[in-house]
Amino acid sequence: MKRPDCIQHWRDVEGADTPGYPGSEEHFSIGAPLARTLGLRRIGIHHERLPPGRRTSYPHAESDEEEFIYVLEGYPEVWINGYLWKLEPGDSVGFPAGTGVCHTFINNTQEEVRLLVAGESNKKHNRIYYPLNPDYAATRQDRWVDHPPQFFGPHNGKPGRK
C-alpha cells in the first residue's frame, strides 16, 4: 500500500544542488522543503544539508518572520552580526522577528552538517535585510530598509576563518 502524502522522507523532496542567488555561482545548503511538500502553508520547515565549505545563505535578518534552527548532525558555526559561534548536535538557535540580528550558518569542517530549519511562512509584510550584500538587496522588492541599527564584528560571513 502506498503511504499517504502526509508522510514524506527528506531525501525524496530534496532540491537540486544549484547556485542559491541570482548572479552568483556560490552554492549554499541543499534544502528539502518539508512543510510545503506536506501541504503546510503557515509554517516553513526545511531539512538542510550543508556540505563542507558552504553556508546556508547570505547573512540576513527578517522583519516579520521568526526562524528556528536545530543542529541534527555535524559541527557548524552560526555567524551572528560578524561573530562565529560553534555549535554541536542538539543545539538550537532562534531568531525573533524584527530584531535586525543578522545570521547565517557556516560549515568550516570536513564533514557534512544537517540542520532542521523552521519558521513562519509567507507573511505578507515580511522584509529582509542583507547587510553584506547591498547590490543583491537592491534588486529585491522585499528589502528591509528601516531595520534596527546593527553593529558588526570582524568576520565576513563567508566560509573560512576570515
Describe every region a protein language model picked out.
Residues 1-42, 128-162:
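A short, N-terminal "cap"/entry segment at the start of jelly-roll beta-barrel domains
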Residues 28-33, 46-62, 100:
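Conserved short histidine dyad/triad with adjacent acidic residue
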Residues 39, 97-125:
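Ligand-binding loop in jelly-roll beta-barrel domains
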Residues 40-45, 63-66, 71-73, 88, ...:
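Short connector loops at helix/strand junctions that flank enzyme active sites
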Residues 41, 79-83:
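Short strand-coil-strand connectors
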Residues 47-51, 61-80, 118-120:
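Short, conserved beta-strand element in jelly-roll/cupin
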Residues 82-98:
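Short acidic-glycine-tyrosine-enriched beta hairpin
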